[in-house]
Amino acid sequence: MQRRQFLNTLATVSVVSPLLLSSRLTQAATPPATPSALDPARWSPLNQKRLQAVINEHGVKSASYRPEQRPYAVFDWDNTCIMNDCEEALLVYQINHLQYKLTPDEFAAVVRQDVPNGAFMKDYTTVDGKPVKMEDIASDVEADYRWLHANYKGLAGDKSLEEIQASEQYKDFLAKLYFMYDAICDSYPVEIGYKWILYFYKNMTTAELQAMAEASNNYAIGDALRKVKYESSRTLPGKAGVVADTHFHGIRIHEEIRGLMHTLRANGIDVYVSTASIDDVVRVFAGNPHYGYGVPPENVIGLRMAMEDGKYTTRYQPDWHFNYGPGKTVGIKNVLVKQKGYGPMLVAGDSDGDAWMLRDFNDTAVGVIVNRMKKGEIGADSQQAAAQLGKPDARFVLQGRDEHTGLMIPDEKSLKYGKDELKLLA
């Protein structure tokens, strides 16, 4: 998955009853019938051949298949099963609709929770190059929220959402709150930022969060893929000053991944998702039949927040691992290997958050890397995939996509947004 996504959503939130959402997620556990062969679709021909060989070797057609020990596959979600990040889309959908259940004092505590004071890393400055301190920008965002809370009719005021969105306070709030998210994720250990985004769900029920997530998904799927720069208010510079950030809008379903999931199940291979987003948000996208992936809610492993009286708190669930990087391997071991006695047959991912689970299990026949030409830990896995290109027993494969369309392409190389040349590696 990729952090640092920013979705400017202005659609009206749809209301989904808990009963209806539960019904939809239950239906998702039974996918439609699919052929046992993997549709070539837009897969790289080499990848389709390798995946089909792995399915044949481990699925129901194999002489060694044992139904009491069903093989399984594990997929990262954001930027693997879809293009872009559904939880980050939700962050801005929540901002745009001011869908908070926080008093101003609660918001003031949440926006500062677990984040050190002091200047962010040098990449995060004001538009005129001055350092931005956490305590200053938090103060500005708190002041914005207090005004928004007092004035928006969906909270404690009487102004419409359209009136609110035309205000300087809203403009400042949107740009600065997302700038904070980016800056926190890049300036401090990633665990701080990944959990911080979840604290804004405080006082929501699971049904309320999932209804908001579905509305956000639907808007993002219909939104254009485009990069837009957002700047905070120049008339309300506050303590931090004027900041700006750029976001890549839109989400797209990766039809080849969705098809692979159905083909795996048709061949007696179970499908799981491991995500560094909160599990309840990804369960909507992975399980709602409107999106077609067919992953039941219990098969999603992600971040978890402690609940109190049926509502989210700002406490991470005690004794639950942080499901990112090495933590994804921990989650697979604690949840799946502990139950089954063996590791995943196939793992798919796109970033450093997935690099360890892609390579940590001896039982894994193939690791599918959605190629984003990244360095770091996933870059090391990608280098191995490039070295094994075309080998019939390749342990890693690179799958290309075009970021202008959000579609996979029949190549190992990818096309970055704004570029016109396919590339294999960073």
Predicted regions and their residues:
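Asp-based phosphoryl-transfer active-site loop
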Residues: 71-84, 358
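C-terminal segment of N-terminal export signals and the immediately downstream linker at the start
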Residues: 1, 21-49
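Non-catalytic, alpha-helical, charged scaffold/linker segments
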Residues: 101-202
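N-terminal regions that are enriched for targeting/export leaders
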Residues: 54-55
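N-terminal export signals
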Residues: 5-26
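C-terminal cap/substrate-recognition subdomain and adjoining C-terminal extension
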Residues: 10, 35-40, 46, 65, ...
